[in-house]
Curated annotation (Swiss-Prot):
Keywords: Amino-acid biosynthesis, Hydrolase, Magnesium, Metal-binding, Serine biosynthesis. The keyword Amino-acid biosynthesis applies. It comes from Vibrio cholerae serotype O1 (strain ATCC 39315 / El Tor Inaba N16961). The active site is at D113, D115. This is Phosphoserine phosphatase. The keyword Transferase does not apply. One of its GO terms (cellular component) is cytoplasm.
């Protein structure tokens, strides 16, 4: 992982979009300020918007367009309805309401969950597979998902199954840790805007500390696996990072970094991220369980983590800070 070569996701207007959607040339700034939602994806076409018009039985005016890295973002007129949501999901396009979206140009904080958000795996499941107890641990995970166990109970029970597993299993998992697409770019982009980036995780320090170091994150907190004589004891040291702990981390860091709560973002995929999402100025469900998606303010369903920057970029339009010259 060459972290010296971290690239940002440039946010800028683009002539290709203007040529594809010439109607956006003549929109007034007043109309843009009224806009309340966006659509984004890797390649937006007039045909997709015609499908949306047909399905919603109305004309959906595009007020502005810009690029965020490889993504294309459209600022939309009118209200986002459940009909819009249905057709956009079918077209595999992301969308978000943008009222009160945090301001990228002011000090900000983003707190990410780790497992299945910052990285593509659930670390405990991978450790368990290598320790030969994959199925037992997966069964406990399933019970927790069904709400039979709370997070702390399920974590302690799963970790207990790892008793006597060799410590080198952890380094095996860490060596091939698959980052979520665009995690490094998300971090680099937000750092370039002067934002702070943190991980708050019910996972393990062995992995979150590694990510903190590799990506130059500002903070990371998760659970510590007890290791004695090169073996896991099956115990977690100290207090478990719970759903409430995650929210507390966000609030404490916001205070520490002098960031207004409005300018905080929480990103996660599981039920234990909901308290943190509710505490933040903007809660984003990322490739999340339906229950989590339903309760979150907004969601990224198809994009990588660059989708979070797509949502935040909308504030630049309202402030007339978007130009042909790329930001950050």
């Amino acid at each position: 992982m060459d972290m010296d070569a971290l690239t940002t996701l440039p946010i800028k207007k683009h002539t290709a979009l203007l040529n594809r959607f010439p109607e956006t040339r003549f929109v007034t700034q007043l109309a843009k300020k009224r806009a309340s939602w966006i659509v984004f994806g890797h390649y937006l076409t007039p045909a997709q918007f015609e499908d949306m018009d047909f399905f919603t039985n109305r004309f959906n005016a595009i007020l502005d367009m810009w690029k965020v890295g490889r993504y294309e973002v459209a600022l939309m007129d009118g209200e986002l309805t459940s009909e819009h949501e249905t057709i956009l999901k079918a077209l595999e396009l992301d969308y978000a309401r943008i009222q009160d979206v945090p301001d990228l140009t002011k000090p900000g904080l983003i707190v990410l969950d780790m497992d299945s958000t910052a990285i593509q795996i659930e670390c405990i499941d991978e450790i368990a597979k290598l320790a030969g107890v994959g199925e037992e641990v997966a069964e406990v995970t399933e019970r927790a998902m069904q709400g039979e166990l709370d997070f702390e109970q399920s974590l302690r029970l799963r970790v207990s199954k790892l008793k006597d597993a060799p410590e080198q299993i952890l380094s095996q998992v860490r060596e091939t840790l698959p980052l979520m697409p665009e995690l490094p770019e998300l971090v680099a982009t937000l750092h370039a805007f002067g934002w702070k980036v943190a991980i708050a995780s019910g996972g393990f320090t062995y992995f979150s500390d590694y990510l903190k170091e590799q990506l130059s994150l500002d903070y990371a907190q998760s659970n510590t696996l007890e290791i004695v004589s090169g073996k896991l004891t099956g115990q977690v040291l100290g207090e478990v990072v719970s759903a409430q702990t995650k929210a507390d981390i966000l609030l404490t860091l916001a205070q520490q970094y002098d960031v207004e709560i409005h300018n905080t973002v929480a990103v996660g995929d599981g039920a234990n991220d909901l308290v943190m999402m509710a505490a933040a100025g903007l809660g984003v469900a990322y490739h999340a369980k339906p229950k989590v998606e339903a309760k979150a303010q907004t969601a990224v369903r198809f994009a990588g983590l660059g989708g979070v920057v797509c949502i935040l970029s909308a504030a630049l339009v309202a402030q007339q800070k978007l130009s042909w010259k790329s930001k950050p």
